[in-house]
A protein has these predicted regions:
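Substrate-binding cleft of carbohydrate-active enzyme catalytic domains
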Residues: 1-168
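Substrate-binding groove of N-acetylhexosamine-processing glycoside hydrolases
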Residues: 34, 43, 91-112, 119, ...
Length: 337
């Protein structure tokens, strides 16, 4: 279970060194301890994520000096403002992040820690920042995206110092096809999560060539804030999402047709339920089940042993059991006939 603890929409964990980060609703250290212990008894590992350098409006709203120079005075509305980033050229950013990583790493037993790295709007931030441009000149860089190298050298050094193995969201040198390279050279010990659906095959091949382990979470199969049928859009963050039906979730091929010999670097699969699109716990379980059952089978079963017709028959008793237990689920009427 990976907990996405920070984003533009809020900061969800108490940090003693920076008490202004957390709003009115957050996990205390005791909450985290209880959650980790509860999960451990059920053989579940809880992995923390602090997303940087983008997705940081909730941080920058409280500590604006951590933004790029031209963004420090800009209005920052938590949950509405986007596209702001931590400044790559400000040494205080790395001091702050070291403190945050130290505290978060100390709360979780998992050897893994996710540090984000996705959807960084570099042209609107680092490319226009005097401090970032100064760092580019010092490093002899020609492209602002190269600043991801020293940025994550600092961030990942802290992760390793506090005993964790880093995970990052997988980004290529283009958001849409065609793309032919990483956004920046990922260190060898980084585990990558492939999430951009159309870019997944390219990323899968590049990571195999370069020796990176990957976790498969392509949005069109694995994003559970996406509606399950036409018109089932969320109450929040409705940006016209594509539809991920139960069948589409089940049809995930983690290896994208590659021979098994080229799939050894795939660690597993991940389903993502983004909380800004979820109003309460009932909506969370409704969006998760039964699609999470489909993901589990997709992750554990080779394609030649998979059968949608068989799954349809086997999933209904599990849906019924959840309903009997009082769990809010989406009843898949299209397969219940």
């Amino acid at each position: 279970l990976q907990l996405h603890l920070s984003d533009d929409q809020g900061w969800s964990i108490w940090i003693e060194t920076y008490p202004k980060l957390a709003g009115s609703r957050f996990y205390t250290k005791q909450d985290i301890q209880e959650l980790v212990e509860y999960a451990e008894k059920r053989h579940v590992q809880v992995i923390p994520e602090i997303d940087v350098p983008g997705h940081t409006v909730s941080l920058l709203a409280k500590y604006p000096d951590m933004a790029c120079i031209h963004q420090r005075e800009a209005e920052k509305i938590i949950g509405k403002t986007g596209h702001m980033m931590l400044c790559a050229g400000n040494e205080e950013v790395y001091v702050m992040m070291d403190d945050i990583i130290r505290e978060v790493a100390g709360m979780f037993k998992s050897p893994l820690m996710h540090l984000g790295g996705d959807e960084a709007d570099i042209p609107k931030n680092w490319a226009k920042c005097d401090l970032c441009r100064l760092l580019m000149k010092k490093k002899n860089y020609t492209e602002p995206a190269q600043l991801m190298i020293p940025f994550f050298e600092n961030i990942l050094a802290s992760v390793r110092k506090y005993g964790k193995k880093p995970i990052l969201w997988f980004e290529l040198n283009n958001e849409y096809p065609p793309a032919d390279d990483y956004l920046f050279p990922y260190p060898k010990d980084v585990v990558l999560v492939s999430w951009r659906g159309g870019m997944t095959p390219t990323g899968l091949d590049l990571s195999a060539e370069r020796g990176h382990n990957v976790i498969m979470a392509p949005g069109e199969h694995c994003y559970y804030d996406y509606p399950q049928y036409k018109g089932d859009l969320p109450e929040y963050n409705n940006w016209g999402m594509p539809m991920t039906t139960l069948e589409r979730a089940y049809r995930l091929d983690p290896g994208y047709g590659r021979p098994l010999a080229k799939q050894h670097h795939i660690w597993g699969v991940m389903g993502a339920l983004w909380g800004e699109a979820v109003i309460d716990i009932n909506r969370a379980t409704y969006m998760s089940f039964p699609r999470a059952f489909a993901l589990a089978e997709a992750g554990w079963t080779q394609m030649e042993n998979r059968s949608w017709e068989s799954f349809k028959k086997r999933v209904l008793p599990n849906v019924n059991e959840l309903m009997k237990a009082g769990v809010s689920v989406r009843v898949p009427f299209e397969i219940a006939r």
